Amino acid sequence: MPGPRPRKGPKTSGQGAETAKQLGLFVEFNPEDMLLGMDETEDDGDLEAELLALTGETGSTSRKPAPKGRAPLPMAHIEKLAADCMRDVEEEGEEEEGLEDDADLLTELQEVLGVDEETGLVDDSEETSPDLSEEKTRDNTEQPVAPAAFQQALPAAVAQAGGPRGLQALLEERIQNYREAAASAKEAGEAAKARRCERGLKTLESQLATVRKGGKICEDEIPPPVALGKRPPAHQERPSKDSEIDSAGSCAMDPGDLSQPESSLPAVAALPDSDPDPQALLLARQREYKAAALSAKRAGDLDRARELMRIGKRFGTVLEALEKGQPVDLSGMPPAPEDLKALPQASEASAATQVLSPAVEQMQPVMSSDLPATPAAPAEPKTVLDALQQRLNRYREAGIQARASGDERKARMHDRIAKQYQDAIRAHQAGRKVDFAELPVPPGFPPIPGLEPRKDTEEDSVTATLAAAQKLASEDTALVDEDEERDTPAQAPLAKKPAQPLVPSSHLLNEPKASSSKESLSPSVREQVTLLEARKLQYQRAALQAKRRQDLEQAKSHLRVAKSLEAQIIQARAGQPIDLSKVPSPLTDEEGDFILIHHEDLRLSQKAEEVYAQLQKILLEQHEKCLLFSKQFMHQGNVAETTRFEKLAEDRKKQLEILQLAQAQGLDPPSHHFELKTLQTVRIFSELNSTEMHLIIVRGMNLPAPPGVTPDDLDAFVRFEFHYPNSDQAQKSKTAVVKNTNSPEFEQVFKLNINRNHRGFRRVIQSKGIKFEIFHKGSFFRSDKLVGTAHLKLERLEKECEIREIMEVLDGRKPTGGKLEVKVRLREPLSSQDVQMVTENWLVLEPRGL
């Protein structure tokens, strides 16, 4: 059996604290112990002796012996640690030892500090020249001085530039520097340096945009210039350029001119590289040429004026390139116009054309690919994908150029167009249909293969339309143009000349294509094209007449219609189907088209005036009928009948003009007769949609009155019900109440929704029809009373587009004697065309009666 538990002895004091320390509890952390790795420093004898010496007390002889602890680190060990720490810095300095021999960094430092590459001399204005000479002899440990020099040189350069304008010039120069550095790095295959230059270029472009908008930037954040490497000095290229200009001038001179040194052209002055503002020089030279052209015109020398003005206009192209930030070589700029006065008048035009034209062309070598009017157009694409890719690349380049010049709005516009081309390329590659007509076309680009070339801009087309309309006029417009030139300043007509030759040139280029394509068209398509061209000509004539009446709004409206007809003509010639229902209707006569001259001494008899009025009324009615029939056939797509009725309408119009002219001159009414003419027409209600049917409740006749109500007190209204799409969702409505009559006139139109191809609609048409109920409106305490019912059958809508029916009003099955007239209209019959033969008494005026 277990024995009794042994009794525990009493615990000694302090044993619990030792246990807690062993468990990690209540441990006193000493920062010096943690730093020096010492367990106890309280019982250090040296420290206690020093403390007693400071306090002036005598040491206690009865203190405990110091426990043996860890001694502090020796100084040799500490020095070794310090040497190890310093060793990294020295090794890093040794790694940077080769930076002094880096040619790119040295060139970059020399450019910032203004040091010449070959001589090593510094500009007088720089204060860092002694530092540079000392830096070349210093040790490798002094190498980090270079970044400080960069930071000091940058504000100095900005301060010398002078304000925001100088800051903008500095940024533009720095952008050009980074572009050249990126290009040279790409050519050398240094991808890292190229990416670094591109990042700096983006920063500079954003800073330039901020400065142009009037914002402020931190000058310390401007990236420093980068080294471009060794390039051939500029003074070596100068003699070659001068020799080329001299050789060009010597080649352009004729041998016959050697005997006449006073008539030779002066040498073309090259613009020095240090010219501060080339734009001001170009503007001044352009103004000189314009002033010289104006003075030559006033002096009567028109040939010289034209030549000077032609040269002056070429400066505009160079100025546009300069504004876009493109590099322009001004070494071939034409001389001042005063230097050309020595030329004889006979040989001035030819000599100026031979010498000055190449000189002006030398100023714009960079712009040959950017201008829309230049002959250097993109290569002709072989496939649709090539054409789309060419245009995508062009708009991307335009967006980059706009963003570089700070025009963010234009850059975003080009990016959106580029996105459209990207979507079009993806859709074309996926085999989906792409509407290429909606894609913008860059100027000067060839058309997409397989498509018709696009026309000019809207302004050019309006100008072309006006020019074509003025050709139709019988007046001589040349004299009017000469008078306008005399009244207006001399510069105004000269500025408009470039737009005028573009119109006939485009037409001359398109005429052979149009004629050849027209010959290959089918007869039906040829009829459509003839109709559209005649309609376009009619609107152009109307626009010209409106312009003569000073009605510019009407003229613009007619020109827009003529422009829309141009697009339809192009589609018809390309073989695409044309919806003739969307072709604008022929113009109708207006009262202001005719001027009636009343003579006081010429009086017509009352009978003659009545005859004239009757004849004019008949002609107007026949003219309107012809236009109506023409419109109906146009909606059917029958071009032949449309043209026929338009010619009849034109004949009625001419007869009406003859009649009004005879009445204005006071003549007797012309001899006339009537002929029976049978016209085959197709009935159609073009104002209706194919998804709607109109129900017209016209009138009630002799409706019965309910018991207790007299016929004169009948307040009638009609309620109808059309069971489509089904009986539960039948279309219902009612007319307004017509009071106190048994023959009410309703004349109300109700629009019913239908689906012509739906089987249920055909079933309702053939079997059910429309049910009508006639009610008498009750008073305040009385309900409505049923008068009678009627039913309309709709089978005739299969072959007719309108049903007009006078139905018997029934009381149950018993007739009441009342009638109800209704009409039902569709756009066109359900199964076939509604062909009608119309016989008209056709009025014919005899010419001998005039």
UniProtKB/Swiss-Prot annotation:
Gene name per UniProt: Cc2d1b
Protein name: Coiled-coil and C2 domain-containing protein 1B
Similarity comment text for this entry: Belongs to the CC2D1 family.
Region Disordered, annotated ranges: 1-21, 54-73, 114-145, 215-277, 436-525
Biased composition (Pro residues): 440-450
Protein purpose: Transcription factor that binds specifically to the DRE (dual repressor element) and represses HTR1A gene transcription in neuronal cells.
Residue ranges with Basic residues bias: 1-10
Record Gene3D superfamilies: C2 domain (2.60.40.150)
